[in-house]
Amino acid sequence: MSGTNQSSVSEFLLLGLSRQPQQQHLLFVFFLSMYLATVLGNLLIILSVSIDSCLHTPMYFFLSNLSFVDICFSFTTVPKMLANHILETQTISFCGCLTQMYFVFMFVDMDNFLLAVMAYDHFVAVCHPLHYTAKMTHQLCALLVAGLWVVANLNVLLHTLLMAPLSFCADNAITHFFCDVTPLLKLSCSDTHLNEVIILSEGALVMITPFLCILASYMHITCTVLKVPSTKGRWKAFSTCGSHLAVVLLFYSTIIAVYFNPLSSHSAEKDTMATVLYTVVTPMLNPFIYSLRNRYLKGALKKVVGRVVFSV
């Protein structure tokens, strides 16, 4: 096997979610609708935060960054799948496959890191309100986001460099709608033990550390809120964090289901469904979840929509 040249497979076939023509047409409309909703919803969040001076706070700064990442995340996978349907092709080059995998992993990491930073921001706001402006300065927030981009790129570069030398000998059909690491490892005729170990160890460290930070933040928040004598005050604090918790649970449950199980136990159908949740559904739902119970954000969104309507 070691002597097999990886160039024997120069491109892959992305089989998508269904091979039935009628289902493919329905899926095309479904994913196009979700993609447009994702871009529009997250773009409205970014515009609202940038236009309304009342939202120029660390919490909304991180939220606008999360919206930007979600737009990029969705752009990495969905347009290629839609283009393949229109052009009636399923091929993607080896380099294109690695590039797509790189950006998918990078935006997953950024989502992961930003959710942790947002949890810390909630922790400081609820548990140390008098020191909030001193701790969460604009300079610190900008440095945090810049640092997250650097760490995410370095982490993804490691996985990509480990994937690049693998050999792919005969089968080039990926039972997925984008180039994900798990189906690629299954296709490889090289020894993928090191890749699996790195994904489960280093990958787990990158995912679990922020998750533990989120848990610790919310444990402190819960203890602090329970000491508040006013029921209205408790509800206000919990409602502020509730939307973030909903996004956290949806994101981490699907990530763990897909990546942190032994390769032999993976089911292509289950993996694909879980992947659809965190690559397509979650980025679409985030703007709705965050704005649903947030009157400040809803007010800013109404202003933006009103400006657009009157300008037309």
From Swiss-Prot:
InterPro entries assigned: GPCR_Rhodpsn, GPCR_Rhodpsn_7TM, Olfact_rcpt
MF terms in GO: G protein-coupled receptor activity; olfactory receptor activity
Disulfide pattern: C97-C189
Keyword check for Cell membrane: yes
Gene3D superfamilies linked: Rhodopsin 7-helix transmembrane proteins
Stretches assigned to the Extracellular side: 1-25, 80-100, 159-196, 260-272
Membrane-spanning ranges: 26-49, 58-79, 101-120, 140-158, 197-219, 237-259, 273-292
Any one GO biological process: signal transduction
Name of this chain's protein: Olfactory receptor 1F1
Lineage top rank: taxon: Eukaryota
Entry's Gene Ontology cellular component terms: plasma membrane
Glycosylated position list: N5
Cytoplasmic compartment residues: 50-57, 121-139, 220-236, 293-312
Organism: Homo sapiens (Human)
Keywords carried by this UniProt record: Cell membrane, Disulfide bond, G-protein coupled receptor, Glycoprotein, Membrane, Olfaction, Receptor, Sensory transduction, Transducer, Transmembrane, Transmembrane helix
Membrane topology, record value: Multi-pass membrane protein
Role: Odorant receptor.
UniProt record similarity statement: Belongs to the G-protein coupled receptor 1 family.
Compartment annotation: Cell membrane
